[in-house]
Amino acid sequence: MSTTAAASDSPETFDIVVIGGGAAGIGVTASLLRRRPGLRIAIVEPAERHFYQPAWTLVGGGAFNIGDTVRPMSSVMPERAHWIRASANAIDPEQHLVRLDNGRALAYQRLIVCPGLRLAWEKIEGLEETLGKNGVTSNYRFDLAPYTWQLVRELKGGKALFTQPGMPIKCAGAPQKALYLSCDYWRKQHVLDKVEVEFNLAGDVLFGVAAFVPSLMKYVERYQASLAFGSNLISVDGARKIATFAVKDAAGGVVRVEKPFDMLHVVPPQLPPPVVSNSVLADKAGWCEVDHATLMHPRYPEVFALGDACSAPNAKTAAAVRKQIVVVAENLLASIDAKPLPALYDGYGACPLTVERGKVVLAEFGYGGKLLPTFPLDPTVPRALAWHLKSGFLPWLYWNGLLKGREWLAAPAKAPA
């Protein structure tokens, strides 16, 4: 691995430029280099640390060590990749250039867009000032997940609010996972009957794949949690411990409703990063436009995208990335070789719903909510096996498989010959 940080007048040229050093960027680079070690690939990533984000929900429930979710970026960067320690500011697909925040430009033959998404904390008035204090927390941040667990342990009664913004978000099940693990702890500590639990969802369904809703509702009822649909968090007054929601009323209008809290778990609105939304690569919603099956850009065939920033309507999860990596690697190399694209993405994503400590509903599904279970078991049933996968095997698979280009259980569908 080489690293570059200095500015230069003329663009440095690479076979492939990858924007983003998250799961998608590191994983697809590793897979490409396993296939063709001679490729000259640059990864544009300013961060010095790499996080295993799927475990932060477990951290917030006291079931995982926060220190085991982070490693130095240098330790996960593929050896033969060129690490560009900078941020991508602009993409010029006409000129095949990526412009960086340090004044440099990188030229590419192929571009992979995977910078993730942006957590828009600022969209909720007063939130940024009170995060990490006054009982306000979020498992969507490395430094706050341990605070979630602290609040859960300390709460002996009162009101606990959990929120979920409008879609799309990273792991649509994560907001309710925080609720379930908190309630499970309170139940075991015999204080759940003293805690008023409310789940405020901007949307109108508990989970987007209907087959899993009955199983989840059993836990909502077990924990005596109330559901407030059409209720979107818009401001937080941490000092007064008041959360304000924009709530849809029966007439279709929107009213402001103030709710007091003792604990507030917030999931922020999530948006495409400006480097994508401000580019000609973006669709109308701001995500990097792709063909949903091939993950190639429909107007710029030198460009591929995967992960949270791409427009494919799949669940934005690491499990989706694991499958997308293989599709992009195979199709990008085929495009270099001027061959038909061989791999098709079926929209696979997975959301291990931690309904209680020790049991998980392993929701695996593709486009249109089609169930795509890995195991020949009823996927809607909570299982201890799925908990062990979530808390033990999947973290190991992430660090030792996905980030290393090892494509276990990730073979894509093939395009018709």
Spans of model-derived segments:
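FAD-binding core/adjacent interface of flavoenzyme oxidoreductases
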Residues: 2-14, 82-190, 254, 265
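FAD-site-proximal beta/loop scaffold in flavoenzymes
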Residues: 128-156, 260-323, 333
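Glycine-rich, N-terminal phosphate-binding loop of Rossmann-like dinucleotide-binding domains
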Residues: 21, 102, 115-116, 164, ...
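A Rossmann-like FAD-binding core segment of flavoenzymes
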Residues: 38, 81-91, 95-98, 106, ...
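Internal hydrophobic alpha-helix adjacent to the cofactor/substrate pocket in enzyme cavities
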Residues: 184, 321-347, 353
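Beta1-alpha1 glycine-rich phosphate/pyrophosphate-binding loop at the start
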Residues: 2-82, 166-210, 416-417
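Flavin (FAD/FMN) cofactor-binding core of flavoprotein oxidoreductases
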Residues: 205, 344-361
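C-terminal auxiliary extensions adjacent to catalytic cores
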Residues: 12, 362-417
